[in-house]
Amino acid sequence: MVNVGFIKMGNLGMSQVINLIQDEIAAREGITVRVFGTGAKMGPAEAADTESFKGWNADFVVIISPNAAAPGLTAAREVWRNVPCIVVSDGPTKKEAREAFEQDGFGYIILPVDPLIGAKREFLDSVEMSAFNSDAMKVLSVCGVVRLIQEELDKVTEQVASGRSGKELELPHIFAKPEKCVEHAGFANPYAKAKALAALHMAEKVAQVNFPACFMLKDIEQICLTAAAGHEIMGAAAQLATQAREIEKSNDTVYRQPHAKNGTQLRKTKLYEKPQ
């Protein structure tokens, strides 16, 4: 039995499903998943609280949080330094910072396409937050990000199942730019793939728009206008992702990759064919 632990500090779009993607119909054998969440907060105090999760004895841990260089996630890495750990975050994007993670023994999947939300009280409420995350999830799922992460987590799970542990595990070190993500989506139609790639580029742009609204602007009109613009970009990206999938559906070429009971990744493209 492979024990996979997930620590969710704060929220990314990918946080909504990351603990579900290895066992999508709850029928996979040989894997057990547990989740420790700190809600919306992601500071050093929340990082310290994750210490109690060590009692479950995970074979490896996935920590997902915005901004892996922030104080909270930095503190969390100290807590989990001696456990095989993969950091999933929207940054850092600089190569030197990512290399430092690797030198410290951490795996990472950095997702610049997982967008920064317009987190200002003047603009964001629970409904706006939920709608934004729904749009983000549409892009992350259809355009290849979900499958990329699922495949990487499955690789580590397979290593544990084969008897490897601790420092023997080969952890991913991935900077998931749009071009890399879309290759995991399995598009057959080039126009569908182009729409998906456009959606990923738009999602990456959202952070550039929302960052000033969150951390720089002071005037309420500028804050609200800028954050609203960022969210409109995300909504348009979700529409492109939907269009891409509809093209594949119309051609009966939607690529599906369900898990067999033993964790093997099966494949199918025709709706009525059996996964092989």
Language-model features: where?
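Anaerobic metallocofactor- and corrinoid-dependent redox/one-carbon enzyme cores
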Residues: 1-58, 64-276
